[in-house]
């Protein structure tokens, strides 16, 4: 990868990390503020958080492999 491509990938990793943090925060807020009343919403929030983590992990691995 070129230096420019690595820079772009790094930006994508940072953006994915931000999205991951937002999803995790929403799950945390659900647990802290709305349980047990809204317990049926847990699977959707958990799935969103899982997918955000997976997206970040894939991008981060690609970045790590190409930075070397």
Question: Predicted regions span which residues?
Answer:
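Short, charge-rich amphipathic interface segments used for partner binding and complex assembly
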Residues: 25, 29-68
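N-terminal acidic leader/helix
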Residues: 1-31, 61
